[in-house]
Amino acid sequence: MGKDRGRGRRNNHSGPYNKSNWRGQKKDRPQNNGGGQRNSAPQQKSTLLETQVGITEFTNPEAPGFTGILKSRFSDFHVNEIDSNGKVLELNDLSVPKVAIVAVAENELDNWRKELEAVIGPEVWQDIANLAKAKNDPAIEQKVEIDVTTLDKEQRTQVHQMIKQLYKGKLLSTTIGQQQAKPKVQEEASLENKDAAEGETSTQKDSQVPAEEKKTIKVFKPKPGRGDKRWSFPADYVTFLVHKTNLVTSDVASTLAARLNLRPSQVNYSGIKDKRAKTTQKFSVKRRTPESILVAARSQRNVHIGNFGFESNTLKLGDLQGNRFRIALRHIAKEKREEIEQALQSLKERGFINYYGLQRFGNSASVPTYEVGVALLKHDYKLACELILKPRDSDVEFLRPIREEWWKNRDSAAAAAQIYGEKFIEKKLLDGLARFGESDYSSALRQIPRNMLMLYPHAYQSLIFNRIASRRIKEFGLKLIPGDLVYVEQDQSEASEEQAQQGEALEEQKEEEPNDEPLEVPEGDEAIEEESIFKRKVRPLTAEDIASGKYKLCDVVLPLPGHDITYPSNECGAWYEEMLAEVGLSSDQLKHKEKTYALAGAYRKMIISSSDLKWSFRMYNTPEDTLIASDWELLKNIPVAPEPAEAEANYMALLLEFSLPTAAYATMFLRELLKQDTSSASQTQLEKQAMAKEDNEKKAVGTQEEQMEVVKEVADEDGQETEQAETQGAEEAV
């Protein structure tokens, strides 16, 4: 009986190995349930790998790599913008400024009053004072009119300012102009106005001349509850910080624009921030009150705004120094701590290769964006259109059959009709083919926003840069060589990079916002001419320069190929023409007749320093533990998960904090550290392996616990049987 009882407990045992430990809840685990094809589809997609876009080398290949999971949760990746003054932007003030009238000193008001009373008369000011004291009567218009025709603009402005300062919204004022007939005798006395009157058609009688404008300031009481709703903030542009979670920057901006009755291009920011992250960045809009902006932001989940300010100019793409990153890498092996410390120190000392990351080249290995760029540069518009519309396994589910149908029958109108909304460039291209004819590929391409079209040739530029950087590091290592390019003057370095990176920020935005209005950035001839000023301000290093010790490897820039660029005077310079020739191009051919596709060239740092890198190790117990507090959580005093003692912790994470300049990719920083592919496919596979390992470990723990329980039960049963036998023997003896 005891043995049966023991077996029953073992069979019904529900130890840890039977529980779901995937992200803490069973409902979160992906289930097959006969629908395996849908869940397995992402695994079958052909995604770009780093080696396919020239990312092959490391600054220190000997440094130990290690496994860490990036962006396991979006709370593991935090980005704070660094503004043009070098300040890290943090959301820490939720107060909303009210209508602010610029204060004027009392003595200045007295001076204005004395000056104006001489012209207007003290009785006018008394009338205004009486108006302010009078009760509101909606039946009549309560006003005082002041003839200010003889006052200049500055004096009229002073009148308005005095009314604002003295009556604080109880009275409003406005300037009214009206045409009045001017007596001929007055014209004769005002010969200086003769030229202004000549050439105007007049219908006045002989005793009159063309009318002049009479100016009147009307001072009036506002309607009850209205007050002064005119713009009275310190400057035209309202700035504010946007803290978002797991959202696309351009989507946040578009929603704000819709709520504020603005075009998307009228909500400005300095650059795109990561989607799967918690990010803080600066926005600006023109003449929208902080209250209205706050109301608009409340309509979006996972968006918080604050830190309002006022500026005279709008934000533009590239108006920043860089970004501050706080990142958690999960599933770090505790026994690898010493090796990880070595890898971190190496990265801090040597920096990393400033590759363009995978997001630069699209999400399809079968049709990377640079292939479209090559077709455009070679004037093969038919091929470019076909590549953009070509079926691919990385498509969203509804778009794939539309592509396949078009590929078979080339009915652009029918295909376009199946794509709803204006988000997809495929729809714009198909609409263009339907409108201009199935063979007018050049005109059809122009239906795609210009900034989006620029993405394609720029992706090819980026591919060349990556390949050149890899070959330069592989063949010459981490040393300066004669002919390497540096900026002529150090203070021009930042300006040149900022100019080039402004174009890059635009491209990054258009990857996520292809259908927005054109933004206020240099384009076409203007952009090429403006950038060329900087591109010629480099020079090759000499042997004497290198011997002087004045320059470091992080000073070296590599060109992005173009028709107006200085190439290195060493062996690297020839590599550009070799790589262009591989696809039938040359630098001269990059001066395209279509300015949208023309590539003048730019410069980009080859190595990025990581001197401000900080790190720490963090213990945690569950995959759901929040390890880094966001701006919002700090502001609201929302605690992160408590950290257990290392001996008691189930897992260890590596917390990183570092800054990067604009246009540098954090994924390339992490690649140098981890020595592993940072593609989404690789990260997904790593996380699956980590979770499988975790499940196996828990199963092993469960098996051990079960075995221990069985041993204990058997021992208990044996003890009970022995006790029963002894009792029975004693009874028999009696």
Swiss-Prot record:
Biased composition (Acidic residues): 505-523, 715-724
Compositionally biased spans, kind Basic residues: 1-12
InterPro entries recorded: PsdUridine_synth_cat_dom_sf (IPR020103), PsdUridine_synth_TruD (IPR001656), PsdUridine_synth_TruD_insert (IPR011760), TruD_catalytic (IPR042214)
Domain of life of the source: Eukaryota
One of the GO biological process terms: tRNA pseudouridine synthesis
EC number(s) given by UniProt: 5.4.99.-
Description of the deletion phenotype: Neurological defects, characterized by behavioral disorders, including increased activity, disorientation, and aggressiveness. Impaired pseudouridylation oF tRNAS.
Domain spans labelled TRUD: 351-609
Location of the region described as Disordered in the Swiss-Prot/TrEMBL record: 1-45, 178-213, 491-523, 684-734
GO molecular function: pseudouridine synthase activity; RNA binding; tRNA pseudouridine(13) synthase activity
Reaction equations catalysed: a uridine in tRNA = a pseudouridine in tRNA; a uridine in mRNA = a pseudouridine in mRNA
Keywords: Isomerase, tRNA processing
First-level EC class: isomerase
Bias (Low complexity): 725-734
Gene Ontology cellular component list: nucleus
Active site residues according to the UniProt entry: D274 (nucleophile)
Compositional bias per record (Basic and acidic residues), positions renumbered to this chain: 184-197, 690-700
Feature: compositional bias, Polar residues: 13-23
NCBIfam families linked to this entry: tRNA_TruD_broad (TIGR00094)
Record-stated family: Belongs to the pseudouridine synthase TruD family.
Biological function: Pseudouridylate synthase that catalyzes pseudouridylation of RNAs, such as tRNAs and mRNAs.
Protein name: Pseudouridylate synthase 7 homolog
Organism whose genome encodes this protein: Drosophila melanogaster (Fruit fly)
The organism's taxonomic lineage, starting at the top: Eukaryota, Metazoa, Ecdysozoa, Arthropoda, Hexapoda
